[in-house]
Curated annotation (Swiss-Prot):
The keyword Cytoplasm applies. Pathway: Amino-acid biosynthesis; L-leucine biosynthesis; L-leucine from 3-methyl-2-oxobutanoate: step 3/4. GO terms for molecular function: 3-isopropylmalate dehydrogenase activity; magnesium ion binding; NAD binding. It is found in: Cytoplasm. Belongs to the isocitrate and isopropylmalate dehydrogenases family. LeuB type 1 subfamily. The gene is leuB. This is 3-isopropylmalate dehydrogenase. It comes from Wolinella succinogenes (strain ATCC 29543 / DSM 1740 / CCUG 13145 / JCM 31913 / LMG 7466 / NCTC 11488 / FDC 602W).
């Protein structure tokens, strides 16, 4: 039987609750699909600051580098917001991405038919939406130098090199080849020099993928078009800052940020996480939606472990659970036949994934 080592980072807030449900689903499905998972827990975020004095202990980095993949919950909270930047939970995640040489973030947005009323947009606008945002993750303005403060002035620098743009472009075009073969590259080339280089480089790389249709869009127009006509998009390729914004905007097409997973890939180990935050205001209440984390576990099986059939089983179990009317509190107003706790939702999906609930 195949064996895989998974690094587990539960993090802060609802992180431990939702990661436990993802593990429950993975455990329910692994044996029947011929593989075994072993988990190793590590600290990151606010809990790491409290226990180890830093947001990312060296032990966590080393453990993640040894693992076949990393499954992560969420970090952060008001408790740590006043700390110096280098001690805030978010700095730990940025450092981990850099340590793992991760450079590409994949964020799918799929509108489930069963939850179409959850969106604030009309059914005619969002029905059938299936978008993948490919975001460059370790370059751009979040990491560019120089940055800092001088008296009453503060500054950051947006920097991209040709190799950085080339490698993220390849990720987007390869993803498009498995989808509808359309890439929309989003930049601000009418204002920013760095975006002009981005557009030139992406256009050149596109020639290596003649089957893929490439279009370009300015970030302000893209933000508007994502609401006006989201079905025009297949794969959206963009930089770190713009991708951070667009992926959160796209998430609301589905009606709940608690539904959507993400994968951060390209380096020594891949990191899988829900796109929502740590939601400390509902932590410990048993009402958090675990679907995004369970879907992230499915992406882990698919992209890092090659267990495609198991991933398909989880995805189908999520759809079946929603079709049967099971809902957590955040989506309870839309077709709910039964309101579930976090634990109950995880158990239902686990049962369907293992074919116990058929």
């Amino acid at each position: 039987m195949k064996k895989y080592e998974i690094a587990i980072i539960k993090g802060d807030g609802i992180g431990p609750e939702i990661v436990d449900e993802a593990k429950k689903v993975l455990d329910a499905i692994s044996y029947s699909h011929g593989f075994e998972l072993s988990y190793h827990d590590y600290l990151m975020g606010g809990i790491a600051v409290d226990r180890a004095g830093v947001p990312l202990p060296d032990e966590t980095i080393e453990g993640c580098l040894r693992a076949d993949a990393v499954l992560f919950g969420a970090i952060g909270g008001e408790k740590w917001d006043s700390l110096p930047r280098e001690l805030r939970p978010e700095s730990g995640l940025l450092k981990l991405r850099k340590s793992l040489e991760i450079f590409a973030n994949l964020r799918p947005t799929v509108v489930y038919d069963e939850l179409i009323e959850a969106s604030t947009l009309k059914e005619s606008v969002i029905k059938g939406v299936d978008i993948l945002v490919v975001r460059e993750l370790i370059g751009g303005i979040y990491f560019g130098e120089p940055k800092g403060r001088e008296g009453d002035k503060a500054f950051n620098t947006m920097v991209y090199s040709v190799p950085e743009i080339e490698r993220i472009a390849h990720v987007a075009f390869k993803a498009a080849m498995r989808r509808q073969k359309r890439v929309c590259s989003v930049d601000k080339a009418n204002v920013l020099d760095v975006s002009q280089l981005w557009r030139e480089t992406v256009t050149r790389i596109a020639k290596e993928y003649p089957e893929v249709e490439l279009s370009h869009m300015y970030i302000d127009n893209a933000a508007m078009q994502l609401i006006r006509n989201p079905k025009q998009f297949d794969v959206i390729l963009t930089g770190n800052l713009f991708g951070d914004i667009l992926s959160d905007e796209a998430s609301m097409l589905s009606g709940s940020i608690g539904l959507l997973p993400s994968a951060s890939i390209g380096g020594k180990a891949a990191l899988y996480e829900p796109i929502h935050g740590s939601a400390p205001d509902i932590a410990g209440q048993g009402i958090a939606n675990p679907i995004a984390t369970i879907a992230s576990a499915s992406m882990m099986l698919r992209h890092s472990l090659g267990e495609v059939e198991a991933a398909d089983a989880i995805d189908k179990a999520i759809v079946k659970t929603l079709k049967e009317g099971y809902r957590t509190k955040d989506i309870a107003a839309f077709g709910a036949k039964e309101i579930c706790t976090t634990d109950e939702m995880g158990s239902i999906i686990a049962n369907y994934a293992a074919k116990k609930g058929e």
